[in-house]
Curated annotation (Swiss-Prot):
The keyword DNA damage does not apply. It comes from Rhizobium etli (strain ATCC 51251 / DSM 11541 / JCM 21823 / NBRC 15573 / CFN 42). The keyword Transport does not apply. Pathway: Isoprenoid biosynthesis; isopentenyl diphosphate biosynthesis via DXP pathway; isopentenyl diphosphate from 1-deoxy-D-xylulose 5-phosphate: step 5/6. HAMAP family: IspG. Belongs to the IspG family. SUPFAM superfamilies: Nitrite and sulphite reductase 4Fe-4S domain-like (SSF56014). The gene is ispG. One of its GO terms (biological process) is terpenoid biosynthetic process. Signal peptide: none annotated. Converts 2C-methyl-D-erythritol 2,4-cyclodiphosphate (ME-2,4cPP) into 1-hydroxy-2-methyl-2-(E)-butenyl 4-diphosphate. [4Fe-4S] cluster binds at residues 304, 307, 350, 357. It catalyses: (2E)-4-hydroxy-3-methylbut-2-enyl diphosphate + oxidized [flavodoxin] + H2O + 2 H(+) = 2-C-methyl-D-erythritol 2,4-cyclic diphosphate + reduced [flavodoxin]. This is 4-hydroxy-3-methylbut-2-en-1-yl diphosphate synthase (flavodoxin).
């Protein structure tokens, strides 16, 4: 018979810790949130601005494209500008095709980056593949940088895939093409990691990733990688898509894998709306980790979905205002009020679940539903503290939330 404990997250998979510019990935460290710019890296101003925005939003590592000489030359300048802004955010260089040449030709770039991302599927082809892969690994050893060996099924090593397909065709009970592709993805990562170690890069400088665009495939390849190695793992559903589809797909895929103790760093690869906010992917990554109980980034606002008892929009507007205020103030609150990210706020719309949910929160309000007495009890630390009445209930509650934060979390600052 199953017990309640059977539904808790599985223990984190034991993985080798990797230091990425002072941020620890794996080894039981908190799961790291990362993101990637979509600027032309050679455009220093726009790249610095976007890296800064992503970092302020909570991205602990930021990847930038390094695709040509101009981009490579810009990297140390970008790093310097960020440091002048007080942002010591580790930058990851995303290399494809000519990474070996760019790192060799631009030593300042090689030094400024905190990690190199290598794609085994396009690091080189035929007889040049292992040679050019080795050149990047040797640069990582020279500059003492970790690497992420990032396999992507959109650019999978075709020689390896063809060999496995041929082998499978000759088998007595052949697997499906999809299963063979999954195996090729996993083997590409593991064989590349083994080659990197053979060249001399230690395991504590290697992170692996296997990215696909289908939920079931992501679950499969990362479960296979986790079973066959103890490398730190980077999770991400590539080409997840736009809007709610991308969010749902990424959450479903990574949520399952994380629940099984797999994953040391995550990136949510959302396609932004035209002129949209790139930081949305950081927020979604944080929310995945927070709702699953793995990390705390911002106070949680619980709010009911509404029903026929809540024809007023007051509770919806209040919940939105509080959520927006929290996001806006967190950069300051995080420093001023240590521990504030653990705060739970409830904004409920009627008497059915309102009082109960509010009691479970640190501070909560149960607004009157349709036909109910126009009064809103406020609960603080599980007890009814007061009742708000009148036309300014929402504004009064917002002030109470700020007051609660100052009194509870400000004490720590004052005592230091």
């Amino acid at each position: 018979m199953l017990s309640a404990a059977d539904f808790d997250p599985k223990p984190r998979r034991a993985s080798v810790a990797v230091d990425v510019g002072g941020v620890i990935v794996g080894g039981g460290a908190p799961i790291v949130v990362q993101s990637m710019t979509n600027t032309d890296t050679a455009d220093i101003d726009s790249t610095v601005a976007q890296v800064a925005a992503l970092h302020r939003a909570g991205s602990e590592l930021v990847r930038i494209t390094v695709d040509r000489d101009e981009s490579a030359a810009a990297v140390p300048k970008i790093r310097e500008r960020l440091l002048r802004l007080g942002m010591d955010v580790p930058l990851i260089g995303d290399f494809h095709y000519i990474g070996h040449k760019l790192l060799a030709d631009h030593p300042a770039c090689a030094e400024a980056l905190a990690k190199y991302r290598i794609n085994p599927g396009n690091v080189g082809f035929k007889d040049k593949k292992d040679k050019q892969f080795a050149e990047i690994i040797e640069m990582a050893i020279r500059y003492d940088k970790p690497v992420r060996i990032g396999v992507n099924w959109g650019s999978l090593d075709q020689d390896l895939l063809t060999a496995l397909m041929d082998e499978n065709a000759a088998a007595g009970s052949p697997l499906s093409a999809r299963q063979v592709t999954r195996e090729a993805i996993v083997q590409s990562a593991l064989l590349s990691a083994a080659l990197a170690e053979e060249i001399g890069l230690p395991r504590n400088r290697i992170i692996l990733s296997a990215k696909v665009s289908q939920v079931q495939d992501l679950i499969a390849v990362n479960s296979m990688l986790a079973e066959r190695s103890n490398h730190a793992l980077h999770l991400g559903l590539t080409e997840a898509g736009m809007g709610s589809k991308g969010i749902v797909a990424s959450s479903a895929a990574m949520g399952f894998v994380l629940q099984h103790g797999i994953g040391d760093t995550i990136r949510v690869s959302l396609t932004p709306e035209p002129n949209g906010d790139r930081t949305r992917e950081v927020q979604v990554a944080q929310e995945i980790l927070q709702v699953m109980g793995f990390r705390q980034f911002v106070p949680v606002v619980a709010a009911c979905p509404g029903c026929g008892r809540t024809t007023s929009t007051v509770f919806q507007e209040l919940a939105q205002n509080i959520q927006n205020d929290i996001r806006k103030n967190m950069p300051v609150w995080r420093e001023k009020y240590p521990g504030v990210e653990a705060l739970n706020v409830a904004v409920m719309g009627c008497i059915v679940n309102g009082p109960g949910e509010s009691k479970h929160a640190d501070i909560g309000i149960s607004l009157p539903g349709t036909g109910e007495t126009p009064a809103a009890p406020v609960f603080i630390d599980g007890k009814k503290a007061l009742t708000l009445r009148g036309p300014n209930i929402a504004a009064d509650f917002e002030a109470l939330v700020v007051d609660y934060i100052e009194k509870r979390f400000g004490r720590q600052t004052a005592a230091e």
